[in-house]
Amino acid sequence: MTYIDGFPRILTVIAAVGAGVSGGVFFAFSAFVMRALGRLPAAQGISAMQAMNRAAPSPLFMIALFGTGIVSIALSGVALTHLDQRWAVYVLAGTALYLVCLIVTVVYHVPRNDALALVDPTGPGAAHAWARYLSPWTAWNHLRTITALAGSTAFIIALGTA
């Protein structure tokens, strides 16, 4: 039996931690942040979400979010040359799951966050825009939370799988 070792093991640890950190951030939004924002008057909820969206693309979070994707893809290249070993299947599953998280982020969340940035929180259509944003954004966030955390779990399993 062969366990993942050497540089691929280091990459797997990085991928597991990165996916877990990203999933944890998304979990916070799903578990309580969006619910709390939804309880605020629309103008306050919009303003708070706009402020978070401006702060989110910090270097540290971008490294965790997209760096994990890059590491996962590189790690999958290694896994593809070891398909006879069980850890490789878990690495490929972890990568696929995490990439779903990234795709949902880029294709769904970023455009909606950009559109929300253009909404005047005190404008006449603000309450309607917020109502259209809040629930679907949260539902799709559940998906990226689940896929990021499931990806992290798959990477962790790969570390101990022979």
Predicted regions and their residues:
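Mid-bilayer segments of alpha-helical transmembrane spans in multi-pass integral membrane proteins
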Residues: L99-V107
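Juxtamembrane boundary at the C-terminal end of a transmembrane helix
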Residues: I157-A162
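Interfacial loop at the N-terminal end of multi-pass membrane proteins
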Residues: R9-I10, V21-F66, P111-S135
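Hydrophobic residues within membrane-embedded alpha-helical segments of Major Facilitator Superfamily
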Residues: L11, G18-V21, F26, V71, ...
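Interfacial segments of alpha-helical transmembrane regions
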Residues: D5-G20, G77-V100
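Core segments of transmembrane alpha-helices
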Residues: A64-L75, R144-S152
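Internal alpha-helical transmembrane segments of multi-pass membrane proteins, especially GPCRs
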Residues: V13, L92, S135-T138, H142-T145
